[in-house]
Amino acid sequence: MNLALFDLDNTLLDGDAETLWFEYLHQAGHLEGNFFGKLEEFTNDYDQEELDFSEYLNFILLPLKKWGPEKVKPWREQFLLEKIEPRLRYQNILHDHRRQGHVLVLITASHDFLAEPIGQMLEMDFTLSTRPEIIDGIYTGKVHEACFRKGKVEILNEFLDIQGFKPNKTWFYSDSQNDLPLMRNCDHPVAVHPDQNLRI
């Protein structure tokens, strides 16, 4: 079998899912206050490969910690329709891999509350994402598994072992230097809208 891996943010999605989520919640009146400055700080840290992922995740999970997933799910459905679906791209590449019988996997640092339904929209065979810690149905703000940098490699290897997959060839599409650990472990790494450092 052959494996086609896809990053989400700024690759299959024109934008960053978690930033778009916060913008949507703010526009819908669910979030108040100036959080854009903090998001910009995290974005700059990400671009410089200096992101404290635990701190970032604790911040990005604020809506789920505040209201809980059941209250937020209806907002998520509207968000997906309004902000995500119009920004999805490269369906032709997905179609080409699917036509060849490749197993399609979305592998993203975005947390699973957003990543899972986006993977379904894209008709992915599997979605691998960051798994926040949940205790008694409550998001703690901590991470169970971070699908970020070398964590993507570890999570992918764990997934392959569980599924019993031994791919003959692997493709990986990404925009970010932070995905270099996984790109170096694939037969066919493909830079899509590469950031400055990945372009170099």
Label every model-predicted segment.
Residues 1, 74, 81-200:
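C-terminal cap/substrate-recognition subdomain and adjoining C-terminal extension
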Residues 1-48:
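Active-site neighborhood of HAD-like aspartate-dependent phosphohydrolases
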Residues 7-8, 59, 127, 138:
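Residue-level signal for pocket-adjacent positions within structured domains
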Residues 13, 27, 48, 61-65, ...:
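Amphipathic alpha-helical interaction elements
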Residues 22-23, 61, 77, 187:
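Amphipathic alpha-helical segments within well-ordered protein domains
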Residues 43-68, 126-127, 131:
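Short, compositionally biased "basic patch" segments
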Residues 55-89:
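Metal-dependent phosphoesterase signature
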